[in-house]
Regions:
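Extracytoplasmic/periplasmic substrate-recognition and gating elements
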Residues: 56, 60-61, 66, 84, ...
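Long, aromatic- and glycine/proline-rich binding clefts that accommodate carbohydrate-like moieties
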Residues: 63, 135-137, 306-314, 328, ...
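Conserved N-terminal structural module of periplasmic/extracytoplasmic solute-binding proteins
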Residues: 5, 10-112, 121-127, 170, ...
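Extracytoplasmic/periplasmic solute-binding protein
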Residues: 141-149, 154, 179-239, 272
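Short, solvent-exposed loop/beta-turn-alpha elements that line the ligand-binding surface or hinge
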Residues: 117-129, 173, 201-204, 219-242, ...
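Glycine-centered hinge/linker elements that transmit conformational signals in sensory
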Residues: 183-186, 229-265, 310, 314-317
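Hinge/lid segment of periplasmic solute-binding proteins
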Residues: 101-155, 181, 195, 210, ...
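A structural signal for short loop-to-beta-strand junctions that line the ligand-binding cleft
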Residues: 85, 92-95, 125-163, 195, ...
Length: 452
């Protein structure tokens, strides 16, 4: 169904004396738009179905125009590297890219993507997008660099059958990290043969390790990654150390998965399509989108999935106010600076993020919507297998990653620290020291601080 192509502007490779051939190639480029996105298997079949539906209507509305997809099969970290190379080259730059919102500032600062303000100023539909989500696609220069099509929250998924076997309460509402650790220890003791606790823990899972694991812990402490008052990165803090210590407790007490399962780029598929449907994991620290793979017609249909696994809020470290924590991010459609067909790309983005197609996307993929109208749609709120109501309730205490252009490099250092602790190659304190050195190297010693 998908037209898999990395479109090259062949005119640059043609006979330079042939003006007719060059004109033909230029014309062809104006009759097609290319959309690059990360294809990570079963985890985003809903995204593909959404894009395919938009493509069909778009081509009907624009006779003679072809929409071509450029799926990039890669781990998260490799995807960003490949995409960066692609958009920097005029011959390979697509017209639209799916942009993880944490990359907006760095890609904008690098000149890789265009601001969209000139289009938004004439687009009345922009008022229907959540203002907090808009912040995630606005760079430090105050300009908008992407139109969001998803947002999310994170929490703890727990298996009600495993909890009952272990004698743990259902519903489960942990009030502190100690409650979470004690539940995992009880599962290990009372229900052998299952993974007590799962959290992404390796470099191969990229931002999922940084955000879904480490930052879900750190932002439940009294500390953060970045001090917006001083505009400095906090490279050492008690909260940072305690977050790594939590990870150490999981793996040193054999409460986590096998390293061969969690240190691979396929970790997301393993937990969502194998361990959870087989009821082989007790607690999973993950996002609201998980049931998207279990929907009817999805990659791993499991209609009763959200009856077996319930979503509960992640507590703060000691239960301190506000009691719970979450992290929110999302994805957007952006236009590379070296795109061939920017105006037509904008027309596609408008259609793809419209009420009609954003509703289709969230129903297919399981993400939360950035649109105010779709958020109130009864079909979305009451969709079978949906956890929209629960996940949306986490927004009131959620946090966002620092919108600073060095964040992607800092995130890579976080992933290295988490993996080092999970594998036991470094102690939590040693891993924090390694992180401090690496971040200082990346951002400069004048841009870091230690919090006592």
């Amino acid at each position: 169904m998908f037209m898999v192509s990395l479109v090259l502007i062949l005119g640059a490779c043609s006979n330079p004396s042939s003006n007719q051939e060059g004109d033909s190639n230029a014309s062809n480029s104006k009759n097609s738009i290319e959309i690059a996105f990360r294809d990570f298997g079963s985890g985003n079949t809903g995204l593909k179905e959404w894009l395919d539906a938009v493509k069909t209507e778009f081509e009907q509305k624009h006779p003679g125009v072809k929409v071509q997809f450029v799926p990039i099969q890669a781990s998260e970290g490799d995807f960003f590297a490949k995409l960066a190379l692609m958009v920097k080259n005029e011959q390979t730059a697509p017209d639209i890219v799916t942009e993880d919102t944490f990359m907006i500032n760095s890609d904008a600062a690098a000149g890789n993507i265009d601001p969209l303000d000139k289009y938004i100023e004439q687009w009345d539909d922009w008022k229907n997008f959540n203002d907090r989500v808009k912040q995630g696609v606005t760079a430090v220069d105050g300009k908008v660099y992407g139109i969001p099509y998803s947002t999310d929250t994170r929490g703890l998924w727990y298996n009600v059958n495993i909890f009952r076997k272990a004698g743990l309460p259902v519903p489960w509402n942990p009030k502190s990290w100690d409650d979470v650790l004690e539940a995992a220890k009880t599962i290990k003791e009372k229900v052998p043969g299952v993974v007590p606790f799962w959290a992404n823990s390796g470099k191969a899972t990229g931002e999922a390790t940084s955000m879904q694991t480490f930052e879900m812990l750190l932002y439940g402490t009294e500390d953060t990654l970045y001090n917006f008052d001083t505009k400095k990165w906090i490279v050492k803090s008690q909260g940072f150390l305690d977050s790594l210590e939590f990870i150490h407790q999981i793996y040193s007490n054999d409460l986590g998965p096998e390293l061969s399962q969690v240190l691979t780029g396929k970790a997301g598929d393993i937990v969502q399509t194998e361990l959870m449907p087989k009821e082989k994991v007790g607690i999973v620290l993950n996002g609201n989108w998980v049931p998207g793979v279990w929907r009817e017609g999805g990659p791993s249909p499991w209609p009763e999935g959200t009856e077996v696994y319930k979503l509960t809020a992640m507590p703060t470290q000691h239960g301190q106010d506000p009691g719970f924590t979450s992290m929110s991010g999302g994805w957007a459609l952006s236009i590379p600076s070296k795109a061939d067909n920017k105006d037509l790309a904008w027309e596609f983005i408008k259609l793809a993020t419209s009420e009609k197609y954003n509703k289709l996307y969230v129903l297919k993929q399981g993400d939360l919507t950035p649109r105010l109208d779709v958020a109130e749609d009864p079909e979305v709120l009451n969709a079978p297998g949906s956890v929209t109501k629960e996940a949306a309730s986490f927004i009131k205490f959620t946090h966002f990653r620092p919108g600073v252009d060095k964040y992607p490099a800092v995130s890579t250092a976080i992933q290295a620290a988490v993996e080092a602790v999970a594998t036991g190659s470094l102690s939590p304190k040693e891993a924090m020291e390694q992180y401090a050195r690496e971040v200082t190297r990346v951002v400069g010693k004048e841009n870091v601080e230690v919090r006592k």
